């Protein structure tokens, strides 16, 4: 559905503008020809933006996410949660900055300010809705689905901050997606191993996991703390860069809302950690075996999440800044 919206919007945009390059579309939007064809062109652009909204699971285009995350096979869910979202954010940033540059003025109005405000509103809605609804979830995959919606909201803060410091904002988005990829893959790896052994994805059935398999419990804890933004996990640094970008773009109110949402999110992440380490279970005497290759995969990913939040922060962020500068050189 989302791909259909994107393709339909792009085909309409080509039909109305005769342009296939992003810079050519930007030139058309600033020309006299656009004023004669404004309504259909804006409709095509709206379809494209809505398509991106579905791709990144931003509210109010999120309604497919919880059901798909819960119903799809867990490996498929893991792929959708990281690869699709990261690629879609990369395309969204490229599209917005190329088609709506800061120099573009339509009817005396800087068009960039419009999508900056739109990104801010969508960020607030996505963060708040995702975190509040996640509080009542009983299925771990469904919880991570609403968490994914909230994560899209955090990332949209970086999109909103693009107007002020393009390179550092793109770097913040890139770092966050890089962190999110490792963190979410770690969480879903634990879910795959747990569900295969127990046949359950209920949060309550995670009770006593620290005694049934300490490695699985530790890996899930690191993943959840990273998603919650707790140091030294990578999520803390990722959120810091996004909040910093928002503050530097004079979006202080947006940054404050982001911090408040991060506190709410930390609560339901810690509830899961509490269940794994504190709650008792009748199945505590039934260990969950994990083969050696999976142990190595979990260990390497845990180390990667920690290193991304400590010694690898500067190298990865500097690489992202250089990449952002080269993207529009």
Segments from the language model and where they lie:
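Alpha-helical transmembrane segments of multi-pass membrane proteins predominantly involved
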Residues: 1-329
């Amino acid at each position: 559905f989302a791909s259909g919206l994107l393709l339909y919007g792009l085909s309409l945009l080509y039909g109305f503008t005769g342009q296939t390059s992003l810079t050519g579309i930007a030139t058309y939007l600033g020309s006299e020809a656009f004023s004669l064809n404004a309504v259909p062109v804006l409709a095509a652009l709206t379809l494209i933006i809505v398509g991106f909204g579905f791709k990144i699971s931003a509210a109010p285009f999120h309604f497919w996410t919880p059901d798909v995350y819960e119903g799809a096979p867990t490996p498929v869910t893991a792929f959708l949660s990281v690869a699709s979202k990261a690629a879609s954010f990369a395309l969204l940033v490229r599209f917005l900055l190329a088609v709506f540059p800061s120099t573009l003025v339509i009817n005396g109005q800087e068009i960039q300010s419009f999508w900056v405000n739109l990104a801010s509103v969508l960020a607030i809605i996505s963060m708040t809705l995702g975190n509040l609804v996640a509080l009542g979830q009983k299925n771990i995959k469904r919880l991570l689905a609403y968490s994914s919606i909230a994560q899209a909201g955090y990332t949209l803060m970086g999109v909103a901050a693009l107007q002020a410091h393009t390179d550092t904002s793109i770097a913040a988005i890139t770092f966050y997606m890089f962190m999110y990829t490792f963190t979410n893959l770690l969480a879903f790896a634990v879910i795959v191993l747990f569900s295969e052994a127990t046949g359950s994805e209920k949060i309550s059935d995670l009770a006593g996991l620290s005694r049934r398999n300490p490695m699985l419990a530790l890996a899930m804890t690191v993943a959840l703390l990273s998603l919650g933004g707790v140091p030294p996990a990578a999520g803390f640094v990722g959120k810091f860069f996004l909040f910093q970008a928002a503050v530097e773009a004079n979006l202080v109110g947006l940054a404050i809302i982001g911090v408040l949402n991060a506190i709410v999110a930390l609560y339901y992440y810690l509830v899961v950690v509490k269940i794994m380490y504190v709650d008792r279970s009748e199945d505590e005497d039934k260990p969950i075996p994990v083969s050696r290759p999976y142990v190595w995969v979990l260990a390497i990913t845990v180390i990667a999440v920690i290193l991304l939040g400590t010694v690898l922060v500067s190298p990865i962020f500097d690489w992202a800044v250089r990449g952002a500068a080269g993207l529009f050189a």
